[in-house]
């Protein structure tokens, strides 16, 4: 009942918008893909790749008939794979030809990619029904487009992408299997609450289940799921470049882009457990677990007036900055909210809700995204939500003419798909190499060791949890947890969500928060899922979401959702899946795309999935990837640069210093003047200049600190580079 309700809830808003305009063929096939993902195994890497490859197919099917745009795959060498293409006659009806090529390409590619899905019967039938509803012939399988057949061109494009996918490093033909990785820790049998103190507390630990059910509701064929995609760094990316790549070895060669540096390992603390970054990060996850109770009277304002508006410059770098950024006891970040909605010029209306409802809804909404499209697919649903909004103007980067629905969707999907794919390649390369532990293992490990705050108190161990009054304490005689024979006296107790043992019927029961044995701590997740089957560092949710936010900001030319706010309704006692709730209806609200991204990041801490160190470094990587993917996509849309040429020009144009105060220098070696335009994050030009010489300084006064974009164009008004700069 809950799952059906959740799909309907999110779709109501979209359906309201959809009735206002006919959807493009690209949008219709994207919706087919998103539904197929919901019925497949929850594999973020695999589906980020599916989203990118299908977006690439649709883009080339569109671009081949555009006089300006440049194809990426047809007739090109992409990622070491050469796709021959001899051209095709210009159609008298371009719109009809594009529709046909896109439909044949998507039908063939999607049918291939989902043939082994657990929902294949339903999914393949849906693909066929959708394809034939256009009047196309599913028996036409020729790839010989030399006669001018647009159906054959679609088939050919799909067959070439399928062939490319069989050698791009994903190991698709053998079921996306791992070749080299093996876990260093034995599985944790969750329900036995066994001693977990013999593990390596820096390495990922598999989880063992009676039955494992993934995020999409599929029963997994193994009761101890393997690490998903630890070697994914080898997969051919979209915009990632060789100068961002390191090949490191931690038992096997790992391909790592945007290396975030190692996460902290546990220290042999000498009565300073709370000052050990490892202990602080993971114990914060346990502390925030205390917020997951609807009986908690704490009320917070979750409107854009009360949350959001975190500046990129505020992201912590040092341990002390982390301790200032995250509120250990009360939850949340230093975001001050937005005083005014820029579209209405009115203050945002406060929305006071129970923190216990907000944290639970947040954890579940972003976990499934919103119903198991996996995180990269979730950002496609947000993109579609934005595209359907009646206030959106489909001007690329907020400028120029209004685009057709098809051109808008094609360009948005390629940019977003490329970014999501690059996030998967980067994040899972990092995960596979650093192989970092998850909170479920780290917290149970430290709780089993004891406490690390005071050697004069019972159960002291340098690897124990820090004692925090009201959150992490020692069990004393007479405590309800002491046991009938005081067998638990001196053990660690945590004030936290009580876990699935206290939920018999998820439609009526709530586990609530209370003191529990530290070795019995659970993330706020379903007992058949608990934690994703791969290492934590860095957070995929944080990386995907920050990249998605950057892409949407750049595509729309506006940091804000249309109308100044995006929303999601969580009805009373109808939204939560594995326990009853929320106790009152609430609406998730985001002023900007970055606010949504930051909220997603916090949700993974409240959900017990990631500590702060996983989060911030993922956000930073995601921001870099989002801008890179946009820049490369833009070069294809403008048709001015091939991939190699773009890389060469981008390499010989640099801007420094970053961050800057009142001036920066543009360095270039192009033999012509460049037009420089400085854009604010909401797409407004704040300065224009002509760069006549190499090492020319640009002076800027009275500019607020924040993120800006420098766009450089040549004398033909062709964009040659877009670079992000930061005003401090």
Residue ranges, per PLM feature:
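Residue-level signal for alpha-helical transmembrane segments in multi-pass membrane proteins
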Residues: 12-19, 62
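C-terminal outer-membrane/trafficking sorting elements
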Residues: 15-18, 644-728
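Acidic/polar surface patches and capping/hinge elements
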Residues: 22-639
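Short alpha-helical segments used as structural interaction elements across diverse proteins
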Residues: 3, 15, 46, 601, ...
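Sec-dependent signal peptide recognition
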Residues: 2-10
């Amino acid at each position: 009942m809950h799952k059906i309700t959740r799909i309907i809830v999110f779709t109501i808003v979209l359906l309201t918008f959809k009735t206002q305009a006919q959807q493009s063929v690209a949008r219709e096939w994207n919706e087919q893909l998103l539904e197929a993902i919901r019925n497949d195994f929850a594999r973020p890497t695999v589906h980020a790749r599916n989203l990118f490859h299908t977006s690439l197919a649709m883009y080339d099917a569109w671009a081949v008939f555009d006089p300006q745009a440049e194809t990426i795959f047809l007739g090109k060498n992409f990622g070491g794979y050469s796709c021959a293409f001899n051209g095709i006659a210009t159609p008298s009806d371009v719109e009809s030809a594009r529709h046909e090529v896109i439909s044949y390409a998507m039908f063939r590619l999607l049918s291939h990619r989902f043939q082994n899905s657990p929902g294949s019967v339903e999914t393949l039938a849906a693909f066929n029904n959708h394809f034939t509803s256009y009047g196309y012939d599913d028996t036409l399988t020729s790839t010989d487009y030399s006669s001018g057949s647009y159906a054959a061109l679609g088939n050919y494009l799909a067959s070439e992408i399928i062939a490319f996918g069989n050698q791009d490093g994903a190991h698709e033909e053998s079921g996306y299997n791992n070749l080299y990785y093996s876990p260093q820790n034995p599985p944790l049998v969750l329900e036995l609450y066994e001693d977990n103190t013999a593990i390596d507390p820096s390495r990922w630990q598999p989880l063992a289940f009676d039955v494992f059910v993934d995020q999409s509701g599929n029963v997994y064929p193994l009761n101890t799921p393997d690490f998903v995609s630890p070697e994914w760094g080898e997969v051919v990316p979209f915009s990632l470049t060789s100068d961002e790549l390191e090949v490191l070895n931690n038992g096997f060669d790992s391909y790592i882009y945007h290396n975030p540096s190692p996460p902290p390992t546990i220290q042999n603390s000498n009565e300073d457990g709370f000052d050990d970054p490892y202990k602080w990060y993971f114990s914060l996850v346990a502390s925030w677990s205390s917020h997951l109770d609807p009986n908690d009277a704490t009320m917070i304002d979750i409107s854009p007036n009360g949350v959001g508006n975190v500046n990129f410059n505020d992201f912590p770098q040092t341990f002390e900055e982390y301790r200032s950024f995250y509120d250990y006891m009360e939850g949340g970040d230093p975001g001050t909210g937005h005083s005014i909605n820029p579209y209405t010029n009115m203050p945002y209306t406060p929305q006071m809700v129970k923190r216990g409802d907000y944290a639970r809804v947040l954890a579940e909404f972003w976990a499934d995204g919103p119903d198991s499209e996996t995180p990269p697919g979730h950002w496609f649903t947000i993109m579609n939500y934005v595209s359907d909004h009646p206030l959106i103007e489909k001007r690329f980067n907020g400028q120029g003419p209004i685009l057709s629905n098809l051109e808008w969707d094609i360009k948005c999907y390629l940019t977003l798909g490329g970014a999501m794919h690059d996030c998967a390649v980067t994040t899972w390369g990092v995960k596979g190499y650093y192989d970092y532990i998850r909170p479920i293992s780290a917290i149970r490990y430290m709780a089993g060791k004891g406490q690390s705050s005071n050697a004069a108190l019972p159960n002291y161990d340098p690897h124990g949890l820090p004692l925090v009054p009201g959150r992490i304490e020692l069990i004393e005689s007479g405590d309800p947890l002491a046991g009938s024979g005081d067998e638990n006296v001196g053990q660690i107790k945590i004030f936290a969500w009580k876990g699935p043992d206290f939920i018999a019927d998820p439609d009526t029961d709530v586990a609530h928060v209370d003191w529990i044995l530290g070795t019995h701590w659970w993330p706020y997740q379903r007992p058949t899922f608990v934690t994703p089957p791969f290492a934590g560092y860095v957070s995929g949710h944080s990386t995907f979401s920050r990249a998605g936010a950057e892409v949407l900001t750049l595509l729309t030319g506006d940091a804000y959702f249309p109308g100044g706010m995006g929303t999601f309704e969580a009805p009373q006692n109808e939204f939560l899946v594995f326990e009853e709730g929320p106790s009152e209806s609430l609406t998730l609200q985001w002023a900007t795309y970055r606010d949504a991204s930051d909220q997603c990041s916090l949700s993974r801490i409240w959900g017990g999935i990631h500590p702060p160190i996983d989060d911030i470094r993922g956000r930073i990587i995601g921001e870099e990837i989002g801008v890179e993917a946009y820049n490369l996509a833009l070069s294809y849309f403008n048709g001015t640069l091939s991939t190699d040429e773009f890389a060469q020009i981008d390499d010989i144009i640099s801007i420094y210093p970053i961050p800057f105060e009142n001036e920066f220098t543009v360095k270039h070696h192009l033999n012509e003047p460049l037009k420089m335009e400085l854009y604010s994050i909401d797409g407004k030009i704040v300065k224009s200049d002509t760069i006549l010489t190499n090492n020319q300084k640009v002076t800027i006064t009275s500019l607020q600190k924040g993120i800006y974009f420098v766009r450089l164009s040549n004398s033909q008004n062709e964009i040659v580079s877009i670079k992000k700069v930061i005003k401090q």
